[in-house]
C-alpha cells in the first residue's frame, strides 16, 4: 500500500479554515478560473502524455515560448512510443532553444520505462507517475490531477505564494524542506471534484503575486 505521511500543521503554527470556508473558497476560485483562465493548447487536453510534455517544458521556460515548441514536439512525437523510440539527434533538435537538455533525455528514459514497465500505457496513479525518471512531486501532482482527476496537489512556487498570503505563513518558500508544509495545506484545500482545475487556478493566481509574505 502506498502511503504518505500526513503533517500536523498545528505544530507549524498554521490554522486552516473551517470546512464551510474551504468549500466557499473552492467555489470562488474555480468560478474565477472559469472566467479568467488562459486558453493554452495543453489545457485543451486530458491526455497524460500531453500534460507531461507541457509540464516538463514549462519547468524552466516561459509559457509564450513553450507553445510553439509544445505543438512541434507533439507533431514529431505524437505518442509515448514514438518518444521512446526517437533517435537522439531528432530528439535534441526538437528541444533546441529550450536548453536544459537533461529534461528531454529524462523524458525519453521515462517513455521507455512506460513501454517496458507499464505495457505502453501511461501510469494512472500518483505512485506510478512518480516512479518515472525526471518526475518529482509537483509534476506527478499536476499529471495526476489534470489527466486523471485525482485529488493530488501540484505545489510550485506560485501556489506557495498564494498559500503564504492566504494563511499568513512565514516559512520561506525558497527552502525546499518547507515544501511539505504547503503540500499538507493543499491536501486539505484541494477541490475533490475538480482537482486539476483547482491546481491550475492557484498557479494562475500565484503568477500574479510577485513575492511571498515577508517574514
Feature annotation, model-predicted:
Residues 25-32:
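Thiotemplate assembly-line natural product biosynthesis machinery
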Residues 14-20, 32-214:
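Catalytic cores of DNA base-excision repair glycosylases
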Residues 8-13:
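RNA-binding accessory domains that recognize and position tRNA/RNA substrates
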Amino acid at each position: 500500500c502506498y502511503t504518505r505521511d500526513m503533517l500536523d500543521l498545528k505544530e507549524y503554527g498554521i490554522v486552516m479554515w473551517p470546512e464551510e470556508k474551504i468549500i466557499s473558497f473552492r467555489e470562488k476560485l474555480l468560478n474565477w478560473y472559469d472566467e479568467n483562465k488562459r486558453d493554452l493548447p495543453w489545457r485543451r487536453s486530458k491526455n497524460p502524455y500531453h500534460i507531461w510534455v507541457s509540464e516538463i517544458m514549462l519547468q524552466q521556460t516561459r509559457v509564450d515560448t513553450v507553445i510553439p515548441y509544445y505543438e512541434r514536439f507533439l507533431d514529431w512525437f505524437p505518442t509515448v512510443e514514438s518518444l521512446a523510440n526517437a533517435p537522439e539527434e531528432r530528439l535534441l533538435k526538437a528541444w533546441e532553444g529550450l536548453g536544459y537538455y537533461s529534461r528531454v533525455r529524462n523524458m525519453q528514459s521515462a517513455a521507455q520505462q512506460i513501454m517496458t514497465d507499464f505495457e505502453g500505457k501511461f501510469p494512472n496513479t500518483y505512485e506510478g507517475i512518480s516512479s518515472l525518471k525526471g518526475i518529482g512531486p509537483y509534476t506527478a501532482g499536476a499529471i495526476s490531477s489534470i489527466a486523471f482527476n485525482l485529488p493530488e496537489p501540484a505545489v510550485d512556487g506560485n501556489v506557495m505564494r498564494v498559500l503564504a498570503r492566504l494563511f499568513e505563513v512565514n516559512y520561506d518558500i525558497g527552502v525546499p524542506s518547507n515544501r511539505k508544509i504547503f503540500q499538507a495545506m493543499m491536501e486539505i484545500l484541494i477541490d475533490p471534484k475538480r482537482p486539476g482545475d483547482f491546481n491550475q487556478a492557484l498557479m494562475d493566481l500565484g503568477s500574479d503575486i510577485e513575492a511571498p509574505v515577508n517574514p
